[in-house]
């Protein structure tokens, strides 16, 4: 019997044995020919032998000493795969990595860890990142869930709120109109929107212009309506900044001014006492303001003006920086009047030109594929869905949805326009940028009296925050030039960062724009600071690129 079993087993394992003849039999029968084989007796004998062999082999195994299972051989079959480790984290589909991404394997691994850190620190349900190098997307990935309830993982195609990055998109519309001679940035806004009343500040007639609106210098309020609280907070921040600057200058010059230390200390204590009530935490933050959760649908930007057009200016236009999303609502109305088109129609044309085909205004009714859900933690520290909001009153300042891929395209279009003028002499065949080089230089030039809340080293420019190149000491920290904008909405956070290459003559003569790193990150959790993470990721890729 043992010999019978061995013979049967050997035949089954041999090439062209049982499995092979079963395959031939199936093909033969499908062709309508008589079945192959040695007759029913041979088949019965073979089946009996197999059954006895399996039973006997089972008995022999029971008597044999236990052995660890053999490691799988990846070359045994083209379909064979190594065993997968079990993980509690959701599987996140990724876009197949382009060949050029292999050059950035180290940067990708390091950046993925940075992304995990910020996600874990804030408890974000999901986060998506995209990176491009010199105009080519080299990495995009999602971590966590786009929809926690239905266990839908984040992926590169996930659509989320981009919040205030919408301001940078609106700036392109304004810039195109300015380039076409249809918009004057420096005349009163009433020339285009007479529905917005003329303003006074402390009894003096003042002018609000498009340029001031773009850089948040118009004095128009943000979500906080209490002018006293806003002014107290500004005073406290100014005092704090002054103290930091004085300390820095003293350290730099090596002077202590010990004689006046006591007097200065006493004065500072008095000033701080005056401003103590306006410290962060006393004043409501944006997410505690009722207007952020509006559910009313507005038909157009002109109609949205009624929310704030009759409110007093908080500061004299041009004198102080006051970040204002409502200022961009007024800019949307200016776009409509200067272009003769509805704001959303004009923006859709721009998105089409830039190949940003998944970027749309956020509306509840339309089916938007791959749209994420948005979350916040309640007072009991439990994850909950955010309430329904209608963003039609602020399309221009924070009402668009997009993907990391579309944001990379937008960033590269801006970087190309910024750099193409430098390459024209060495390559006359280059296409023009979507915006002219002089326009991009204007947009990315810091404006006096402004602030950049997400990086104190920078200033606000024209719908972008800009950090300029700076190095104070030799062989010490070098501050890179970059432009970025962050976003914070109900249940969402975002950032788009552009790190231009520091160009030299060799690069200009042998390469083509855009030259630099673009990073976009979107997250379905509010109040997540992403700019520093985006900058670290950009520098990781820049390091690999340089090597």
Curated annotation (Swiss-Prot):
<dbReference type="InterPro" id="IPR052794">
    <property type="entry name" value="Mito_Ser_Protease_LACTB"/>
</dbReference>
<dbReference type="GO" id="GO:0019216">
    <property type="term" value="P:regulation of lipid metabolic process"/>
</dbReference>
<dbReference type="GO" id="GO:0042802">
    <property type="term" value="F:identical protein binding"/>
</dbReference>
<feature type="active site" description="Acyl-ester intermediate">
    <location>
        <position position="164"/>
    </location>
</feature>
<keyword id="KW-0007">Acetylation</keyword>
<feature type="modified residue" description="N6-acetyllysine">
    <location>
        <position position="342"/>
    </location>
</feature>
<dbReference type="GO" id="GO:0006508">
    <property type="term" value="P:proteolysis"/>
</dbReference>
<keyword id="KW-0378">Hydrolase</keyword>
<dbReference type="Pfam" id="PF00144">
    <property type="entry name" value="Beta-lactamase"/>
</dbReference>
<feature type="compositionally biased region" description="Low complexity">
    <location>
        <begin position="62"/>
        <end position="83"/>
    </location>
</feature>
<feature type="modified residue" description="N6-succinyllysine">
    <location>
        <position position="284"/>
    </location>
</feature>
<dbReference type="InterPro" id="IPR001466">
    <property type="entry name" value="Beta-lactam-related"/>
</dbReference>
<dbReference type="GO" id="GO:0008233">
    <property type="term" value="F:peptidase activity"/>
</dbReference>
<comment type="function">
    <text>Mitochondrial serine protease that acts as a regulator of mitochondrial lipid metabolism. Acts by decreasing protein levels of PISD, a mitochondrial enzyme that converts phosphatidylserine (PtdSer) to phosphatidylethanolamine (PtdEtn), thereby affecting mitochondrial lipid metabolism. It is unclear whether it acts directly by mediating proteolysis of PISD or by mediating proteolysis of another lipid metabolism protein.</text>
</comment>
<keyword id="KW-0645">Protease</keyword>
<keyword id="KW-0496">Mitochondrion</keyword>
<keyword id="KW-0043">Tumor suppressor</keyword>
<keyword id="KW-0443">Lipid metabolism</keyword>
<feature type="modified residue" description="N6-succinyllysine">
    <location>
        <position position="283"/>
    </location>
</feature>
<dbReference type="GO" id="GO:0005739">
    <property type="term" value="C:mitochondrion"/>
</dbReference>
<dbReference type="InterPro" id="IPR012338">
    <property type="entry name" value="Beta-lactam/transpept-like"/>
</dbReference>
<dbReference type="GO" id="GO:0005829">
    <property type="term" value="C:cytosol"/>
</dbReference>
<feature type="transit peptide" description="Mitochondrion">
    <location>
        <begin position="1"/>
        <end position="115"/>
    </location>
</feature>
<protein>
    <recommendedName>
        <fullName>Serine beta-lactamase-like protein LACTB, mitochondrial</fullName>
        <ecNumber>3.4.-.-</ecNumber>
    </recommendedName>
</protein>
<feature type="modified residue" description="N6-acetyllysine">
    <location>
        <position position="297"/>
    </location>
</feature>
<keyword id="KW-0809">Transit peptide</keyword>
<dbReference type="GO" id="GO:0006629">
    <property type="term" value="P:lipid metabolic process"/>
</dbReference>
<feature type="region of interest" description="Disordered">
    <location>
        <begin position="62"/>
        <end position="96"/>
    </location>
</feature>
<comment type="similarity">
    <text>Belongs to the peptidase S12 family.</text>
</comment>
């Amino acid at each position: 019997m043992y010999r019978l079993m061995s013979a049967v087993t050997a035949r089954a394992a041999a090439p062209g044995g049982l499995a092979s003849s079963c395959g031939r039999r199936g093909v033969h029968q499908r062709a309508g020919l008589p079945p192959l084989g040695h007759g029913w007796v041979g088949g019965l004998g073979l089946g009996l032998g197999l059954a006895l062999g399996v039973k006997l082999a089972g008995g022999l195994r029971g008597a044999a000493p236990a052995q660890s299972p053999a490691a799988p051989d990846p070359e045994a079959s083209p379909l064979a795969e190594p065993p997968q480790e079990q993980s509690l984290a959701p599987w996140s589909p990724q876009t197949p990595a382009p060949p050029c991404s292999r050059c950035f394997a180290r940067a990708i691994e390091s950046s993925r860890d940075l992304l995990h850190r910020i996600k874990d620190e804030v408890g974000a349900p999901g986060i998506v990142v995209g990176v491009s190098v010199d105009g080519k997307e080299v990495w995009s990935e999602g971590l966590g869930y786009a929809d926690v309830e239905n266990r839908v993982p984040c992926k590169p195609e996930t659509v989320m709120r981009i919040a205030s990055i919408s301001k940078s998109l609106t700036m392109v519309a304004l810039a195109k109109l300015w380039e076409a001679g249809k918009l004057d940035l420096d005349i009163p806004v009433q020339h285009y929107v007479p529905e917005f009343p003329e303003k006074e500040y402390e009894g003096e007639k003042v002018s609000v212009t498009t340029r001031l609106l773009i850089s948040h210098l118009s004095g128009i309020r943000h979500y906080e309506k209490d002018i006293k609280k806003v002014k107290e907070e500004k005073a406290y921040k100014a005092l704090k900044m002054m103290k930091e600057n004085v300390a820095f200058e003293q350290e730099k010059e090596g002077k202590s001014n010990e004689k006046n230390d006591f007097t200065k200390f006493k004065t500072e204590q008095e000033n701080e006492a005056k401003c103590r009530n306006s410290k962060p935490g006393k004043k409501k933050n944006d997410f505690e303001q009722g207007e952020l959760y509006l559910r009313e649908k507005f038909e157009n930007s002109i109609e949205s003006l009624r929310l704030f057009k009759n409110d007093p200016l908080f500061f004299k236009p041009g004198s102080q920086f006051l970040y204002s999303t409502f200022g961009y609502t007024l800019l949307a109305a200016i776009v409509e009047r200067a272009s003769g088109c509805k704001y959303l129609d004009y923006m859709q044309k721009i998105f089409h030109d830039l190949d940003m085909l998944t970027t749309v205004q956020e509306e509840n009714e339309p089916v938007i594929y791959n749209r994420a859900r948005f979350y916040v933690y309640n007072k009991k520290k439990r994850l909950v869905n955010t309430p329904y909001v209608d963003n039609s009153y602020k399309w221009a300042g924070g009402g668009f949805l997009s993907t990391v891929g579309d944001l990379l395209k937008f960033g590269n279009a801006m970087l190309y326009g910024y750099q193409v003028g430098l390459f024209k002499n060495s390559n006359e065949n280059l296409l023009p940028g979507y915006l002219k080089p002089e326009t991009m230089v204007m947009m990315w030039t810091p404006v006096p009296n402004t602030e950049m809340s997400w990086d104190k080293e920078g200033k606000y420019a024209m719908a972008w925050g800009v950090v300029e190149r700076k190095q104070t000491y030799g062989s010490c920290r070098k501050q890179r030039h970059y432009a970025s904008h962050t976003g914070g909405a109900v249940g969402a956070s975002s950032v788009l960062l552009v790190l231009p290459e520091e160009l030299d003559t060799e690069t200009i003569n042998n390469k083509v724009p855009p030259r630099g790193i673009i990073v976009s990150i979107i997250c379905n959790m509010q109040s997540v600071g992403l700019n520093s993470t985006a900058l670290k990721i950009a520098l990781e890729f820049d390091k690999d690129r340089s090597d």
